Structures are given as C-alpha cells and as structure tokens.
Amino acid sequence: MQTSAEMGGIIEAMPALAQDGYALEQAPPEHCPGPASENAGKGDACQGCANKDICESLPKGPDPDVALITQNLAPVRHKVLVLSGKGGVGKSTFSAMLGWALSADEALQVGVMDLDICGPSLPHMLGCVNETVHESSVGWTPVYVADNLAAMSIQFMLPEDDSAVIWRGAKKNALIKRFLKDVYWDELDYLVVDTPPGTSDEHITINTLLKESGIDGALVVTTPQEVALLDVRKELDFCRKAGIRVLGLVENMSGFVCPSCENESTIFKPTTGGGRALCEELGIKFLGAVPIDPRIGRCCDSGESFLDAYPDSPASTAIMHVVEALRDAVGDV
C-alpha cells in the first residue's frame, strides 16, 4: 500500500502532456494541432514552440491508450456522465446521492469516479475522505465505501486534505487518462462519472477516450432559474456537437421542503418554466425535480447517505424516482 505522500509524488511527477497524451517540454500553445496530427510540428502555431521537434518526430495515428481504456472498462455495463452548465447547482452532491441510491440495490455493483480534478468533493460526501488508493499488479484499486459502492478521486492522492490542485489542462487530462486506464473496477453495473461544471478540456478528453468503450449518455443537472438554464443550453449544445446522448435532465433545488412539517415552498422561481419547460422545448427527457432539504447538506458534511438517514423525505422520494427514470433510460429495467 502506498501512503498519501507517495501517491502525491506520483501525480506531481506527471509530465506536462499535450491533449493527445504525449510528454512535451511545455504546455502546448492555444492553437496546437496536436502531436498526433499530420500537421504536428508544421503548423503556424508550431513556429517558436519548444515542442516543435518532439511533435515532428512522434508517430502519427490513433492514441494507443484508447484500446487499453476500452479493455479496462469492458466489464462496466453502464457509464453515465453527470454534467452541469455551471457550478453551484448541486451536480457533485447529486452524483454522490446517485451512487448511494444505485447501491441501495444490493444486486448492483456501483462505481463513482470524481473527475472534477480541481474541486474533488465526492470523497467527503461519501465519507471516505481520509482513505488512500492501493496500487497493485492490476492497477489502482478504488476505495470501497460499501460492499457494492466504490469511489476514485484525486483527493485520495493529495498529501493534505486542503492541498490545492493547480494544474493546466494538459496535466489534468493526463490524470483522467490514468483514471480510465489504470483503475481496476472489476465488474460494475454502473460507473457514475462526476465532471467539472461547464464545457472544458476535461469534457473533451473524457468523451474522446470513452467513445470506443461506449458511454450510455449524460445526466444533466440544473436549478429552476433562467440564469442556470442559459448555461444548460450551452451544455446540451456541447453534447450534441460531441455526439453524447442526453439521458435526461434533473431539476435540483426545485422548491424547499420544511423538515418539520414537510410543506413545500418555492425558493428559486422558474421564471421561464424551469427544467421541465426546457425539456419540452428541446425534446429531452425530464428525469425529475428534487426539492431542497437542509438535511442533505448535513449528510454530505458527515459523509452519510441522506437516503438511508431520511428515507421518508420528499427529496429522497424524488431522488429514487430519478434513479428509476435513469435506469429506464439506459434500458436497465
């Protein structure tokens, strides 16, 4: 077993990588054609770049790691990306609850992968923030939260809990590749992939590397107000351009449930109809609306399952309905 300090050494020792996974002397320029491109080292952006000679000498063609990733993830039946147009809508919280909810079915083996490299919060919400990753002959072994719920995050590799990850996109992409290629999940029914908010390098990398192994699709999280829906439209446009199937949309923080009387009131007014209206407009499946329950935050802080602690909460009921709709969307019913 390796300590957190040793694992931290592994990730700090990672070279700066270009977007296609090759070791370079410095981060690639903005309009880099990519070291695997036929134009590598020859384009206008290559002139004056410290990587020019390296890129010209590299073999061209498909990334060989894609085949290894496909082989590693072959035992995973369903891969679901959790996306959001902006931060603060509860995407990571919902990813954690999705892991808890799916693993409530003891017949399912579930994995949760935290690819929000600069803001890894899933280990805290799953109650395993102080765990470390084991490395064996078969690869990195994820941390098991329960017998049928495993998690993987860069948080397990940081030397300190509050250590910041200050990386450029290329280095983050390199770690994503290692997570997909080297984490030994064994057989899983579901792999829930929590991604950063927005549409960034990480999203492009994830989609490129997982295309061959097959992604069931994306679950998109929003809140009711128009300022969130504006960014969700951009996220949905990204999915369309990247060829990612949208499994459906979840409206989080949809009203407030009083823990005492369980009456529901509106907090974020859906000025344009909220997530449901957006789904009707764009022809997307509306997976459900989850109300605010302050106890969700307390459970996330303490690393316990809100669904187990408060099974009768309207929020718990709504989450389980979303899970049923998700399983239906991937054909698992």
Swiss-Prot record:
Please state where this protein is localized.
Answer: Cytoplasm; Nucleus
Classification via Pfam families: ParA
Quote the record's binding site residues for [4Fe-4S] cluster 2. Answer: C258, C261
Q: Name one GO biological process term.
A: iron-sulfur cluster assembly
Gene3D superfamilies in the cross-refs: P-loop containing nucleotide triphosphate hydrolases
Q: Got a GO cellular component term for this one? A: cytosol
Q: Which residues bind [4Fe-4S] cluster 1?
A: C32, C46, C49, C55
The protein's required cofactor(s) are namely:
[4Fe-4S] cluster
The free-text note explaining how the cofactor binds reads: Binds 4 [4Fe-4S] clusters per heterotetramer. Contains two stable clusters in the N-termini of NBP35 and two labile, bridging clusters between subunits of the NBP35-CFD1 heterotetramer.
User: Which Gene Ontology MF annotations are present?
Assistant: 4 iron, 4 sulfur cluster binding; ATP binding; ATP-dependent FeS chaperone activity; iron-sulfur cluster binding; metal ion binding
- Which keywords belong to this entry? 4Fe-4S, ATP-binding, Cytoplasm, Iron, Iron-sulfur, Metal-binding, Nucleotide-binding, Nucleus
Identify the residues that bind ATP: G85, K86, G87, G88, V89, G90, K91, S92
The text of the family note is: Belongs to the Mrp/NBP35 ATP-binding proteins family. NUBP1/NBP35 subfamily.
Q: How does it assemble?
A: Heterotetramer of 2 NBP35 and 2 CFD1 chains.
What protein name is recorded for this chain?
Cytosolic Fe-S cluster assembly factor NBP35
Species name: Eremothecium gossypii (strain ATCC 10895 / CBS 109.51 / FGSC 9923 / NRRL Y-1056)
